[in-house]
Amino acid sequence: MGGQGKAINRKRKFVGRKADDPEFDLDKKQFKVLHLNATEKRLIIVLEGAQLETVKVHNTFELLNCDDHAGIMRKNQRDPGSCRPDITHQCLLMLFDSPLNRAGLLQVFVRTEHNVLIEINPQTRIPRTFKRFAGLMVQLLHKFQIRANDSSRRLMSVIKNPITDHVPVGCKKYAMSFSGKLLPNCRDLVPHGDETSASYDEPVVIVIGAFAHGVLKTDYTEELFSISNYPLSAAIACSKICSAFEEVWGVV
């Protein structure tokens, strides 16, 4: 999508990653190393339908959003509710700041509504402000990867579909939706069993819709669950699920 929306009357500077910017890369000592294999215990979150799309404004690209590009959206008859990258930003802030992530028990994927699949290194520090996050996403969507400042380590990368090629074979895969079967307690999502049993250490995939309105549709999940009597934002759903896994797995 491109355009010169009438509401845009000034050039905006591309907000990218500076060479000395610590915003995107935390000290490795703050994290436990996550060795990914088919049997290792972890929560795998997939943010589906993320509304991450770039738009050309004058001579630069920006992350399309309903606040900054109202003119472009009107010109193209786009619903403001369909351009909410801030939802993905809120979810990623919550997930990557969680104790579960610091303990090395969280893995995150993002798939956009245009079917772009993104993998994010657990050691990535998500930008605090939306403006900086938007600049980073533009960089990622155009260059397909973001690397750490001090090494060749990839912090974010665009990877090949399908998502099932990147998660353990045979693990449980659940989708979250207000219309799903109500679970009395989020902890019911956590694999249960004796600590010495294989089921105790099983990874589990949970899919959350990263959009404001609409129905979450996937072809790889087994069951659809609701975790509240009330509709929840994607970020709150992420928070409740992470907290449940932290409680069961003893992460403090």
Swiss-Prot record:
GO terms classed as biological process: defense response to bacterium; ribosomal small subunit biogenesis; rRNA base methylation; rRNA methylation
CDD domains for this protein: Nep1-like
Keywords: Methyltransferase, Nucleus, Ribosome biogenesis, RNA-binding, rRNA processing, rRNA-binding, S-adenosyl-L-methionine, Transferase
Molecular function via GO: rRNA (pseudouridine) methyltransferase activity; rRNA binding
Annotated InterPro entries: Alpha/beta_knot_MTases (IPR029028), Rbsml_bgen_MeTrfase_EMG1/NEP1 (IPR005304), tRNA_m1G_MTases_N (IPR029026)
GO terms for cellular component: nucleolus; nucleus; small-subunit processome
Cysteines joined through disulfide linkages: none
One Pfam family named in its UniProt record: EMG1
Annotated binding of S-adenosyl-L-methionine, by residue: 176, 209, 214, 227-232
Compartments, as annotated in UniProt: Nucleus, Nucleolus
Signal peptide: none
SUPFAM superfamilies: alpha/beta knot
Top-tier EC class: transferase
Record field: catalytic activity: a pseudouridine in rRNA + S-adenosyl-L-methionine = an N(1)-methylpseudouridine in rRNA + S-adenosyl-L-homocysteine + H(+)
E.C. code: 2.1.1.-
Top-level taxon: Eukaryota
Site (Stabilizes Arg-84): 86
Record site feature (Interaction with substrate rRNA), residues: 84, 125, 128, 132
Family that this chain belongs to: Belongs to the class IV-like SAM-binding methyltransferase superfamily. RNA methyltransferase NEP1 family.
Subunit and interaction comment: Homodimer. Part of the small subunit (SSU) processome, composed of more than 70 proteins and the RNA chaperone small nucleolar RNA (snoRNA) U3.
PANTHER family: NEP1/MRA1, RIBOSOMAL RNA SMALL SUBUNIT METHYLTRANSFERASE NEP1
Function comment: S-adenosyl-L-methionine-dependent pseudouridine N(1)-methyltransferase that methylates a pseudouridine in 18S rRNA. Involved the biosynthesis of the hypermodified N1-methyl-N3-(3-amino-3-carboxypropyl) pseudouridine (m1acp3-Psi) conserved in eukaryotic 18S rRNA. Also has an essential role in 40S ribosomal subunit biogenesis independent on its methyltransferase activity, facilitating the incorporation of ribosomal protein S19 during the formation of pre-ribosomes. S-adenosyl-L-methionine-dependent pseudouridine N(1)-methyltransferase that methylates pseudouridine at position in 18S rRNA. Involved the biosynthesis of the hypermodified N1-methyl-N3-(3-amino-3-carboxypropyl) pseudouridine (m1acp3-Psi) conserved in eukaryotic 18S rRNA. Is not able to methylate uridine at this position. Also has an essential role in 40S ribosomal subunit biogenesis independent on its methyltransferase activity, facilitating the incorporation of ribosomal protein S19 during the formation of pre-ribosomes.
Protein name: Ribosomal RNA small subunit methyltransferase NEP1
Taxonomic classification: Eukaryota, Metazoa, Ecdysozoa, Arthropoda, Hexapoda
